[in-house]
Amino acid sequence: QAPSDKVIPIISQNEVRNPDGSYQWNYETGNGIKADETGTLKKGSKPDEGDFIVAQGSFSYTGPDGTAYQVQYSADDENGFVPQGAHFPTPPPIPPAIQRALDYLATLPPTPEARP
């Protein structure tokens, strides 16, 4: 698709930054894109770790085919960026025989590490 020379207006845009490191922003464009995010500053749990941001947000837009897309996400030091959306592919179900085998294996005691 060729780039458009059409200027898309910003309908609304807000941003708040707080002294404690937390923030909130959102915007909406003339072509229906919306986005928002909130974040807080979290102290590292170890003395050698710095502070980091924990964020939650969402964005939505309409694709070229007219389909509405919405994504919610979180981001932190433990899980990284974790998006969720109804349009994301999902894995196929695990066949029952394989699931039974996995369940059985989970009940077994740990085995010693293999030695070279």
Swiss-Prot record:
Modified positions (Pyrrolidone carboxylic acid) in chain numbering: 1
Pfam families from the UniProt entry: Chitin_bind_4 (PF00379)
Domain Chitin-binding type R&R: 20-92
InterPro entries given in the database record: CHIT_BIND_RR_consensus (IPR031311), Cuticle_Struct_Prot (IPR050468), Insect_cuticle (IPR000618)
Residues the record lists as Proline amide modifications: 116
One GO location term (cellular component): chitin-based extracellular matrix
Glycosylation sites: 90, 107, 111
One term of GO molecular function: structural constituent of chitin-based larval cuticle
Domain of life of the native organism: Eukaryota
Keyword Glycoprotein found: yes
Post-translational modification: 3 variants exists that arise from a sequential glycosylation with N-acetylgalactosamine at three (ABD-4A), two (ABD-4B) or one (ABD-4C) threonine residues.
PROSITE patterns per UniProt: CHIT_BIND_RR_1, CHIT_BIND_RR_2
Keywords: Amidation, Cuticle, Glycoprotein, Pyrrolidone carboxylic acid
Positions of region (Disordered): 78-97
Job description of the protein: Component of the soft endocuticle of migratory locust.
Protein name: Endocuticle structural glycoprotein ABD-4
Source organism per UniProt: Locusta migratoria
Top-level taxonomy: Eukaryota, Metazoa, Ecdysozoa, Arthropoda, Hexapoda
